[in-house]
Design a protein with these regions (language model features):
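N-terminal first-folded block
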Residues: 1-34
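A generic structural signal for short beta-strands and their flanking turns/coil linkers
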Residues: 16-18, 39-43, 75-79
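Solvent-exposed beta-strand sheet faces enriched in polar/charged residues
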Residues: 23, 46-48, 82-84
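Short, flexible active-site-adjacent loop segments at beta-strand->alpha-helix junctions, enriched
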Residues: 26, 51, 85-87
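A short, structured beta-strand/loop element
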Residues: 31-49
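A short interface-forming secondary-structure element
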Residues: 47-57
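C-terminal structural segments of small proteins and small subunits
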Residues: 55-89
């Protein structure tokens, strides 16, 4: 399974999002630190979920980072997060 798909599946299971978009931006970082041949190192996530209601931006990021801890400890070098509650979207 590709990293992008694994990220999407884990976030879906953890947060039951109303919307989720996972973008592989690795191609934009060729030649930069953390880039590896084959990509799948730099990602951007847009997620809207009730789970984020009443949570601070930092708390939301922590929730996502905990969910993706194995990916962040492994092949993922960078993860940009845009997490919102439904009323904020």
């Amino acid at each position: 399974m590709q990293t992008k798909q694994r990220i999407a599946e884990k976030l879906t299971l953890a947060f039951s999002p109303q919307s989720l978009e996972v973008l592989d931006e690795s191609h934009q970082h060729e030649g930069h630190a953390g880039h590896r041949p084959g990509g799948e190192t730099h990602f951007r996530v847009y997620i809207v979920s009730d789970a984020f209601d009443g949570k601070t931006r930092v708390a939301r990021h922590r929730m996502i980072n905990e969910t993706l801890s194995s990916e962040l400890a492994g092949s993922v070098h960078a993860l940009a997060i845009h997490a919102k509650a439904p009323g904020e979207a």
